[in-house]
Amino acid sequence: MKLRSTALVKGFRQSTPYVNAHRGKTMVIMLGGEAVADRNFGNIISDIALLHSLGVKIVLVHGARPQINQLLEKQDCHTPYHKNIRVTDEYSLGVAMQAAGQLQLAITARLSMSLNNTPMAGTQLNVMSGNFITAQPLGVDDGTDYCHSGRIRRIDIEGINRTLDQGSIVLLGPIASSVTGESFNLLSEEVATQVAIRLKADKLIGFCSEQGVTDESGNVLAELFPKDAKQILERLTESQNPAEDMSTGTLRFLKGAISACRAGVPRCHLISYKVDGALIQELFSFDGIGTQVVMASAEQVRQAQIDDIGGIFDLIRPLEEQGILVRRSREQLEQEVHRFTIIEKDGLIIGCAALYAYPEDHMAEMACVAIHPDYRDGNRGQILLDYMRHQSKSRDIDQIFVLTTHSLHWFREQGFYEIAVDELPMEKQGLYNYQRNSKILALNV
């Protein structure tokens, strides 16, 4: 009899909602030349092929910066940079075209063989490259002629969409032609960012050497709004040598993520190309593994609805079994669901609280406060309390009270103070359980 892996079963169950959510979505994935050169590159390609097999529409953009540098060094040729952009002369353009062409063939070959030795062996995976990008020269800046370094002039969005709808992966590189037939070397980060924006992609995903963006203590910041990300970008730009970012890519990707998010791409992810399975962990788990730059948080605070009863029930049941919360039947939840406020993340209810108003006394009880065990290190309790206070003010409530047996200190930290049973509304006094002996605390709204 084969041993069954509980972790595998649990992981598969948790990932199922994301499989359905991502199917049919368009994702632009940016692979810098550093990622292509890393030993984990083969695993990244396998994960991209897996995404494609799950119905995700993929545009893969690759860079070639280290490969170009390597070829130039072999030929004892060095190109200058101006404002962190390579000045591509006639000779280095030929080298760039050679490096980009080799990478395009290598990536195509890897994708084509990525499903070998898997249950999906024999499945056709088409990779399409083409003249989807039209370039134009960067021109002269502060007296420096960028020569064959260029920028995007036009993107054939209809052509890309048509190719994606046919079931192919679109592969784009850093070399593009102009309307006059000249070739230009583009910033791959700009290509990925602009394609994601104009394609109205659901996600932009960038691989860098670091596992996303970290705070000053080295902890990965799971979620950033563009404004906060911009401040971090400015701080890192001041402290980091531009040459260092040439090898890590964090600043380049973060800059692109901010631009894309502000232009309407809902979620932009930064993950590490050094971590095996980072792409899968980021897209198919509750918390991900890297950093998201988002316009709207993945967590939503809202009034509970009838469809939320099952999630609320699952959240509070362990606390009821421990005696922390008073037991509520499913029938009671159905009758009182309109009193509940929930915090929802990707379809999972991770927090809840209920408000029971006593209008004649201008008081309200905040009850059934619960936070999912995996999310108790944040400020979600404070968020629920603030929501309760806002509701109370709008309903002419002057005071919120709670009955607690385990969270006395937390409520005191929020400004609650102890009151006696006879200070409760008369209706609540008659329901007070002296055997449970809960502490009663109040907060002036």
UniProtKB/Swiss-Prot annotation:
Gene Ontology annotations for the cellular component aspect, listed alphabetically: cytoplasm
InterPro entries noted in UniProt: AceGlu_kinase-like_sf, Acyl_CoA_acyltransferase, Asp/Glu/Uridylate_kinase, GNAT_dom, NAGS_kin, NH2A_AcTrfase
EC number per UniProt: 2.3.1.1
Subcellular localization, as worded in the UniProt entry: Cytoplasm
Chief location: cytoplasm
Known pathway: Amino-acid biosynthesis; L-arginine biosynthesis; N(2)-acetyl-L-ornithine from L-glutamate: step 1/4
Reaction catalysed by this enzyme: L-glutamate + acetyl-CoA = N-acetyl-L-glutamate + CoA + H(+)
Coiled-coil region(s): none
Highest taxon in the source lineage: Bacteria
Keyword Transcription on entry: no
SUPFAM superfamilies (UniProt xref): Acyl-CoA N-acyltransferases (Nat) (SSF55729), Carbamate kinase-like (SSF53633)
BP term (GO), one: L-arginine biosynthetic process
Signal peptide segment: none
Keywords from the UniProt entry: Acyltransferase, Amino-acid biosynthesis, Arginine biosynthesis, Cytoplasm, Transferase
GO molecular function: L-glutamate N-acetyltransferase activity
Stated family: Belongs to the acetyltransferase family. ArgA subfamily.
Matches recorded under PANTHER family: AMINO-ACID ACETYLTRANSFERASE, AMINO-ACID ACETYLTRANSFERASE NAGS1, CHLOROPLASTIC-RELATED
Protein name stated in the entry: Amino-acid acetyltransferase
Annotated source species: Vibrio atlanticus (strain LGP32)
Gene label: argA
